[in-house]
């Protein structure tokens, strides 16, 4: 149930709150409890900082229907992520302990707690803050004081809600949880009320819990001995440049593209120079075409000091494109790290000189001169 004046829609504002947190703090392991249709997970998979993304929900049918929205697209294979990403979907209850959700940087519970019975809520806080104990927890829940602005709302906003708290009740619960489990909590929200109803507060109230301690390895190891109870609905590893086959493919794509650019530019300048010299040379059929150096200016390559060893050159009918020239491309350097890696990754896809320091291209001098 949402009012028309929420722009963007309230659910998007809740997701944006989480995304802003991710932008700021760069968590590597993120889980969404009560993930339902996986909409938040679908959005977060595009953040390079996240390496592990987990969704947990009690409804296996919904997870099975929506899991395909989290599988890699063709674009993910064409342009792999810089960092690894593993996505897991589990069917299970938020009141159950399972080692699969240990060691997380951020766990979100968006509009979840109001669906829990009182006993479940008590177990939930023990499982989340005592067992899972992530560095940060973001919990959102409806603000009951806002309901007077919903004309058709005579009870709770959703038939499955077991309760809806006002601001005082939510703050009291959050403060008690923070004190009990050694967290700091800040209360905020999304969904601004109309100007004439500011006194009701946000439509969705949000608590951000931050852990005040560092969990020991011994504590984690003890928890890891807990029996697994969640059912895996999806396990997928996204293609990334951390895998050699994807890194090699990316290096070849970038490096050989620039090598081909250098070759094309060389021939263009070569032909242009020949055409300029033609009126002044009566013996055009026997002009030497050897040892021509390229002095080009590349918009896509960095402008560095002149270095003879980096310049392409012709030797008989072979064009030599030094690997130093290719390695000077920022993206190539970023991907490879050093010249040896560049040489290794293009071997087999390009013809290299005997010393392995240049890419070779056969040039048809008869048609070029």
Swiss-Prot record:
Disulfide bonds: none annotated. Mg(2+) binds at residues 111, 114-115, 161. Its main location: cytoplasm. InterPro entries: Hen1 (IPR026610), SAM-dependent_MTases_sf (IPR029063). Binds 1 Mg(2+) ion per subunit. S-adenosyl-L-methionine binds at residues 39, 57, 93. Belongs to the methyltransferase superfamily. HEN1 family. Methyltransferase that adds a 2'-O-methyl group at the 3'-end of piRNAs, a class of 24 to 30 nucleotide RNAs that are generated by a Dicer-independent mechanism and are primarily derived from transposons and other repeated sequence elements. This probably protects the 3'-end of piRNAs from uridylation activity and subsequent degradation. Stabilization of piRNAs is essential for gametogenesis. This is Small RNA 2'-O-methyltransferase. It comes from Xenopus tropicalis. The lineage of its organism: Eukaryota, Metazoa, Chordata, Craniata, Vertebrata.
């Amino acid at each position: 149930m949402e009012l028309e004046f929420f722009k963007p829609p309230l659910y998007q504002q809740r997701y944006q709150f989480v995304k802003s947190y991710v932008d700021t703090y760069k968590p590597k392991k993120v889980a969404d409890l009560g993930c339902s249709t996986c909409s938040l997970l679908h959005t977060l998979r595009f953040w390079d900082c996240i390496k592990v993304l987990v969704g947990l929900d009690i409804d296996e049918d919904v997870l099975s229907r929506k899991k395909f929205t989290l599988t890699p697209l063709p674009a993910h294979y064409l342009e792999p992520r810089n960092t690894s990403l593993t996505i897991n979907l589990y069917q299970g209850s938020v009141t159950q302990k399972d080692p699969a959700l240990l060691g997380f940087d951020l766990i979100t519970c968006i509009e979840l707690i109001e669906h829990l019975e009182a006993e479940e809520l008590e177990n939930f806080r023990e499982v989340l803050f005592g067992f899972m104990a992530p560095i940060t927890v973001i919990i959102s829940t409806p603000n009951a004081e806002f309901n007077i602005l919903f004309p058709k709302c005579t009870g709770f906003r959703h038939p499955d809600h077991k309760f809806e708290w006002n601001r005082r009740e939510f703050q009291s619960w959050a403060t008690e949880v923070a004190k009990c489990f050694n967290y700091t909590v800040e209360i905020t929200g999304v969904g601004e009320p109309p100007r004439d109803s500011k006194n009701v507060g946000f439509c969705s109230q949000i608590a951000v819990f931050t852990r005040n301690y560092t969990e020991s390895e011994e504590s984690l190891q003890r928890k890891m001995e807990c029996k697994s109870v969640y059912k895996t609905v999806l396990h997928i590893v996204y293609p990334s440049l951390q895998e050699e086959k994807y890194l090699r493919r990316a290096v070849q794509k970038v490096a050989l593209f620039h090598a081909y650019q250098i070759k094309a530019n060389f021939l263009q300048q070569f032909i242009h120079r020949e055409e300029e010299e033609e009126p002044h040379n009566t013996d055009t059929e026997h002009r030497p075409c050897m040892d021509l150096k390229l002095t080009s200016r590349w918009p896509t390559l960095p402008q560095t000091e002149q270095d003879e060893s980096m310049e392409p050159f012709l030797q008989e009918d072979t064009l030599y494109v030094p690997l130093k020239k290719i390695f000077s491309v920022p993206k190539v350097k970023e991907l490879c790290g050093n010249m040896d890696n560049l040489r290794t990754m293009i071997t087999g896809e390009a013809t290299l000189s005997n010393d392995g320091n240049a890419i070779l291209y056969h040039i048809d001098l008869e048609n070029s001169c």
